[in-house]
Structures are given as structure tokens and as C-alpha cells.
């Protein structure tokens, strides 16, 4: 077989034995060569064998030798190739031992490699366990922190819910107030409606916002900035909302100069029609253009009388205030012309007409005076008036305020603030009436004392006239005089004797003679005492009945609480959360406080009414005697 074939090149080991046999056969037939040539070939073969052994060791298998080089292919054709194959067979035992050793080593290495992953796996598991043990406290800490965070989050949620509820309640209150402002406003309506909805309770028929602004500006007439600077818009809108919602309190919400000026101008600007009315404003303009001053004043007076009363009153207050501003021209640098330039557009009139009205205002409104407004008393007021006249004026103010509250509540604008204000006004009215009644009683007593002192005869003169005797009477007539004096003394004793009284069999009252000045007073006191004792007995009976009712309700409550606990245990129903309990408790505490206040007010009113009934009963029973 040709060694140069591709099969020989690809698989040299398969054809090595056949080549060796062929070479051995040829070697016997060939002639002997020289020794030098043999020795050189042997050396070459030995070197090649060593190379082949080293290559076999490196490759790790002995059955197949490495690929033959081109030199080996040439040498296989030589006659001495049989010796080479025999030497290769002799060295196979050593190579086998080496191969076995290498195999043992490889097996040991493989076993060791197999054992190493198992050991390393165990070590890793131990390390993981240790890490888990180490991580357990950390995990616990993390869980505790997470729980704390959850608790904080729950608390925040509860607070947020409470804040939302409070905000909702505030929104509800503000919504109710906004409904009042939208449905019953003061700004942007006619003068009559504004006066009715925000009246001054001292009898002046102008809106309260105009009165407050004018009262404040009257104290700052000398200020140079009056009607010249603009306020902060948010502050102006805040005061507008307060007056629309009837919440303005002069003690809390204090005006300043720019706000007072702009608030007055805002009210006048937002009027739906001019202050002089749309029907008469053209005639006012015609009169203002009249050249004669005297005829101008008379015609203006006639036109003013045709205005509605509330429009005329408001115009009078505004013009008199502007006149007071002009009178301080030396300080505020404002005269009639400059003030008319500033405010005539606000009043919806021409500059000429406003100047004419300012010139004649003192004559046109001679009966009007700018009086500072004193609001009605409130619960925070220090004390009640001390004189009957002041009490009567305050009663008129409180009655006016009460009628205004009733009209607003009848229109459907009912809020808790309105209810509290209603009870407060009623309480103040009862206190004022009680104090006025005490003054009236004192006046009646003083009048009775004056009448009794004027109608009583002088006692000394009667005694002198009875005891006087003639100077020249004889001594024999002494017995007659004594006998005549005895009946006189008998007739005087019934008048002066303190025990001269009678007892009424039906009532048991002590009755003095009709001529006695203390008869009526004593009888009045006895009747009043009798009425008060009846009231006391009635109250005692009611107290006993109330105590019995309380005892009955306590027993009923205990039975119902036991039944409800048993029912809840049987059903196993869960109680509502604490937030709901807190909300319910807050709601009912507020309601109870309001009801307690109402109860106290009603109790005081009932007491006053009962006292008035007793006084009337006393007067009726006095008529029987």
C-alpha cells in the first residue's frame, strides 16, 4: 500500500503493523550494508523511539502512535525497519506501567475533585446557616422597625382622617355661611335690602357696613392719605365676606384707613342703581346746572323729599361725612372739587352735581347728625346699663337684633352660631327686663311713701287741742273733767294699739285696719309668700318625681347593657374602630354642651316667667281685699 495515499496520512497507526511486516520480509532478502551505515541508522531509530515515547506520554494513549512525519515515512521503506518494530514491542511494559500510574493519578484527582465539591458544599451550607443566624436579629430589627413604621402610618392616617373630618365640618360651616352670603348678601343689593339685612339697631336706617366705615373715618379726618390710597385686595375681600356673613366683630376685626375708604366706595359702587335712583338722577342733574343758588337749594330739597327714606338717610350720612372731610382741608389737602373728582364716579353722578350737593348739604340735612354707633350688648360685655333710660334703649337694640335673627332663620339660614346668638340675645333681654322691673318697683315704693307722708294728719296738733283746758275752771269740776277724758282715751287706743288687727278665716292672712298705711304692703308680702311656698312645694314634688325617673332609667340601662353584652358575645361581632368611637364621642359632647346651654337658658327664662306670674297673681289677689 502506498504510504503517500491520503488514508495513510489521516490514519497512520492503522497501517503501521502491515508496513512493519513487509519491511521484515524485505530485510531478509536484501544484502548486508556497511556497519557505519547500520550504526547511523540505529542511532536515528533510537532517537525517533524516544521522541515517539514522549509524544505518547503527552497524548495519553498507547494503542495509536502519533502521526508519522515525512522522515518516518521515508524510514519505513528502509530494510532495518523490522528491528524498530521489535524494540517498540519490548518497551511496551514500561509504558503500560506509566500509563497505569497516570490513570491512577487521574482517578485519584477525579475522586478528589468529586470530594472537594461535596466538602465545599457542606462548608458553604454551614456558612449560610451562620449567616442566617447572624441575619435573624437584623431581620427582627427590620420587622420591628417596619411595624413601628406601620403604626406611625396608621396614626398618621387617623390624624389625616380626623383632620379631614374637621376640615369637612369647617367646610360645612363655611358652606352654610357662604349660603347665607349668597342668598342673603349685603353688597350688590338695593339700599332697602341692605339696610334690612344689615341694620343698625339704634334706629338709624343705613347699612351697618356704611356706619362702621363712616365712624372709623370720622376719627381720621386729618389724615392726609384719606381717600387717596388703595388697600390690599385680599383684606378688602375679607371684610366684604365678614359683612356678608354677619360675622364682623369690631373688637376682633379692626379696620384701617385704606380698607375703610375702599369698603365704603365698594358698597356704593356695587349698588344696582344710583343712590339718587334712576328716575330722579336726570332731574338732579338739571337742578345742578341751575345758575341761581337759592332756587337750586329749594329744588334740591324738593327732589330729596321724593327719594325713598333709606336712600335719603344714606345720602345724608355720606354727604355730611364728605363735608366733614372737606372742613379738614388744611390737614388732608382735600376740597370739594378734588373730593368730587375722586368720588363722583362711585356715587354715579356728575362732578357738578356732587359739588352742588356738598355746598348745600348742611342746609339740606339739618335734622341729621353723625352719631357714633354703639352695638348691642353681648355675653362678653362687662355689665348691664345702670339707669332705666339706658336699659330701655338697650332693650330696643336687643329687640331689633332678635327680630333680625328671626327673619334670617325663617328665611332658612339656620346655623349653630345663629342658634347660640338667639339664645344669648334672649338671655340678655330677660336680664334687662328683670333689672328694669326692679327700678319700677323702687319708683312705686318711693311714690307710695310720698303719698302716705302727705296724707297723714299731724298728731301733735290733735293732742294739743284735746288736752287744752280753760284757765279759770274751779276745782270742783275735776271729777267731771276726768270722766270726760276717759272715753277720749278709749277712742284713741284702737288707732295706736299694735294688736288691733283681724285674721282672715279663709286665707289666714293678718289684716290691718284700712286706715293703716302698712295694710297693703303687709297683705302683698303675705300673698307673695303664699305663692312662693306653693312654687316651692311644686318644685319639691317635681324633684322627687325626677329622682324616681332617674332610678328607673338606671335600672333599665343596666338591663339593656347586660343584654347587649350577651348578644355581642353570642354573635361574636367586632366593635367598630377607635376612630369611629372618637368621632361619635366628639359629636355627642358638642351636642350635649349645646343642649346643656339651651337647658340653662330655658331654666332661667322659666324662672323669670314664673316670677312674673307670681307678681300678677299677687296683684289679682290684692283686688279681693
UniProtKB/Swiss-Prot annotation:
Phosphoserine modification, residue list: 68-69
Location of the Rho-GAP domain: 191-385
Listed Polar residues bias regions: 475-484
The entry's keywords: Developmental protein, GTPase activation, Phosphoprotein, Repeat
UniProt cross-references to InterPro entries, sorted A to Z: RALBP1 (IPR039767), RalBP1-like_Ral-bd (IPR049041), Rho_GTPase_activation_prot (IPR008936), RhoGAP_dom (IPR000198)
Biased composition (Basic and acidic residues): 1-11, 20-60, 94-157
Result when mutating residue 229 to V: In RNA edited version
Reported effect, residue 254 to G: In RNA edited version
Transmembrane segments: none
GO cellular component, one term: membrane
Gene Ontology MF term list: GTPase activator activity; small GTPase binding
Signal peptide range: none
Matching SMART domains: RhoGAP (SM00324)
Site features described as Arginine finger, chain residue numbers: 228
Impact noted for substituting residue 265 to R: In RNA edited version
Residue span of region Disordered: 1-172, 443-500
Domain of life: Eukaryota
Effect recorded for residue 230 to G: In RNA edited version
Keyword Repeat carried by entry: yes
GO BP annotation list: receptor-mediated endocytosis; regulation of Ras protein signal transduction; small GTPase-mediated signal transduction
Keyword Ribosomal protein recorded: no
Function of the protein: Participates in receptor endocytosis during interphase, is also involved in mitotic processes when endocytosis is switched off.
Assembly and binders: Interacts with CycB and numb.
Protein name stated in the entry: RalA-binding protein 1
Originating species: Drosophila melanogaster (Fruit fly)
